[in-house]
UniProtKB/Swiss-Prot annotation:
It comes from the Bacteria. The chain crosses the membrane at residues 6-26, 38-58, 91-111, 117-137, 138-158, 171-191, 214-234, 245-265, 279-299, 316-336, 337-357, 377-399, 419-439, 466-486. It is an enzyme of class 7 (translocase). It catalyses: a plastoquinone + NADH + (n+1) H(+)(in) = a plastoquinol + NAD(+) + n H(+)(out); a plastoquinone + NADPH + (n+1) H(+)(in) = a plastoquinol + NADP(+) + n H(+)(out). This is NAD(P)H-quinone oxidoreductase chain 4.
Amino acid sequence: MNPDTFPWLSTLIFFPIMATVALPFIPDPKGKGDPIRWYALVIGLIDFVLLIYAFYTQYDFAESGLQMVEHYDWLPQLGVQWSVGADGLSMPLILLTGFITSLAILASWPVTYKPRLFYFLILAMYGGQIAVFAVQDLLVFFLVWELELVPVYLLLSIWGGYKRLYAATKFILYTAISSLFILVAALAMAFFGPDLTFDLQSLAAKDYPLTFQLLCYTGFLVAFAVKLPIVPLHTWLPDAHGEATAPVHMLLAGILLKMGGYALIRMNVELLPDAHAYFAPALIILGVVNIIYAALTSFAQRNLKRKIAYSSISHMGFVLIGIASFTDLGMSGAVLQMVSHGLIGASLFFLVGATYDRTHTLILEEMGGVAQNMPKIFAMFTTCSMASLALPGMSGFVAELMVFVGLATSDAYSLAFRVPVVILAGIGVILTPIYLLSMLREIFYGPENKELTSHEKLVDAEPREIFVIACLLVPIIGIGLYPKIITQIYDAKTTQLVAYIRPSVPSIAMREAATVASVSDIEMDSSYQAPAIK
């Protein structure tokens, strides 16, 4: 078969899903689930290797449009088709999905309860998350977006902590109800005009009136604000993280939150640019609220998982600011922040899980003095925390700096608007090391809990755990030292996207129109002569 016509994306989506069929038939003579774990890990790695191969052989960095495109009629009477493709916006997140999921499978080695069902859900979620980033049909996007909720709900409700049913129910209520807004907006856009279609490129080409755009934008924003999440629609996340296991933490922080940021750019910005110009100042304000409020709330948390969860909410505020900056640098920083936080968030939550497995507590006051028992975990926790507080030389620093500079240099907003926003966001950056460093002090060098530190099970990191963190730190440091590793994947796309949406900004459009008019006046004035060059 010609490699140019091979259905790469469909293969990457359906391979892990189809592989789940074999899970009930894998023999497990010892009843510990070891063969099942190895099978799931092999399937995850095979899919990731195929993804890397497809990326290096099929993806063109200089191309801003869709690549590896596939179109198959599904319900032609309704204008629905299985249409997938990857561009600079989706490809980094597809790569992130393969990387994080493979490591999450390795991180799930201690899971012994119902391993067949557990890995069935993980592999099904793997394919579904790639589909969310690849599908180019709005109705199919809604379907895979909804189907993603089922594995997460079951992973929370079956393998979660003491309040797992409450956390899982809250998650499904928030996300399922908000997702109805996607369906309503999708149907409205599909039926608008003479042609019934759910194809994203066809929808982007339609000429919607501004009021219609604003209504659809609001519907999409509500749904994606829950998943991102945006304050005040964030309260499901601390509860979900508070009850999840380590591998589910990694999937939530590493991939699930990025679905909200990706969808906000793909649907709100690309399909509804005029409405985005009106909503952009509000998005920036919401981003600042996310940064400040979540940072202050994280500082007050005494539960380790909830503290890191609020830290995630704070960092996602930079994504909102970058998306609304109307600059190449700001938009690029938003995409980089999603990738960076996916890596950093996954590493921190994995270490939280490793610490809990040893201490059996998440309350900071009940920890203390464990650095002497767990020096390797302390070193890894400290390094990942430095990445989270945007230490120079790590990916978080580059992403946040790009967002800051992108907004500060944006000509879409007045100086009176930009300066307070940059100052307030900067305060949020200052708060981050305060709560993260105090967290490290309380866990590892706080008042020693003799009963805890003398326990024989309080052992240091094992090779598997060191390997997982090492795999996450390599791209975190690599991107921090040489950001082009990742930015070259999406630079062409973000540049094209910003050029597409900038004319929708009234202030920019007025200036450009005035410039064009002045040039036209000069050209039309027959008496005008260029000054002679002496």
